[in-house]
């Protein structure tokens, strides 16, 4: 099983990187990625998944409030079951080049808020309900069952994780999610990638660490 090859480090270049594209001159992409952990501990993997949903809700609300536009930012938690100790948490937003500074401020502010205070029960419910519904719907289709069968030998605990997952999700508290944000989404701990139009000045040349 190549156990000696199941280690994957996260880059030490925790800084801002700028890439250029040849598309429309008004389009930019901001991405921030933090290292997290693998997916062997189901409870912690679910906490990160729920934090992902909350990040998306909070950031969407913040961008709408600050910029007055209905941008659809993304957030993603990936906890590897192949590489030991490896996982990532990422946030991204595709925006107008003129709004890169305000968007970046909104992202870093949202991350800081999740570290500094526990989210409300209302926000937690908004994030958790769709995940619980996905558990209920998973085995209503042939595709859901085939997903279990397909990995029955490579991931024999998959069914057990499914059975336990719903109750673990219900038990997650705002305080636990704040602790997860504090542990993994550290200030200065992210790799930031800004994709900007070729030939356009970098609006964040002197940006502080994310």
Question: What kind of feature is each model-predicted range?
Answer:
Residues 10-12, 48, 63:
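Extracellular/periplasmic bilobed ligand-binding domains
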Residues 178-196:
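Bilobed periplasmic-binding protein-like "clamshell/Venus-flytrap" ligand-binding domains
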Residues 18-19, 61, 77-79, 165-167, ...:
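Generic recognition of flexible, low-complexity loop/linker segments
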Residues 32, 42-56:
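Active/ligand-binding-proximal structured segments within catalytic/core domains
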Residues 1-27, 36-37, 196-210:
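An aromatic/glycine/proline-enriched structural segment found at the starts
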Residues 26-43, 64-171, 191-196, 203-206:
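M16 family metallopeptidases and their MPP-like homologs
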């Amino acid at each position: 099983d190549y156990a000696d090859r199941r280690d994957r480090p996260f880059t030490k270049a925790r800084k801002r990187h700028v890439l250029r594209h040849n598309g429309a001159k008004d389009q930019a992409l901001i991405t921030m990625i933090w290292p997290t952990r693998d997916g062997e501990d189901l409870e912690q993997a679910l906490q990160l998944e729920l934090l992902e949903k909350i990040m998306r809700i909070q950031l969407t609300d913040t961008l709408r409030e600050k910029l007055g536009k209905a941008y659809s930012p993304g957030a993603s938690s990936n906890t590897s079951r192949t590489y030991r100790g490896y996982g990532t948490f990422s946030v991204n937003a595709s925006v107008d080049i003129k709004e890169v500074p305000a968007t970046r401020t909104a992202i870093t502010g949202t991350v800081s808020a999740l570290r500094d205070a526990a989210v409300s029960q209302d926000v937690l419910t908004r994030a958790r309900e769709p995940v619980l519904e996905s558990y209920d719907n998973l085995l209503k289709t042939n595709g859901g069952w085939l997903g279990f069968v397909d990995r029955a030998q490579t991931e024999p605990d998959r069914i057990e994780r499914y059975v336990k997952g719903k109750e673990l999700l219900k038990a997650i508290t705002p305080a636990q999610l704040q602790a997860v944000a504090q542990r993994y989404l550290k200030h200065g701990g992210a790799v930031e990638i800004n994709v900007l139009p070729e030939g356009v000045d970098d609006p964040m040349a002197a940006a502080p660490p994310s």
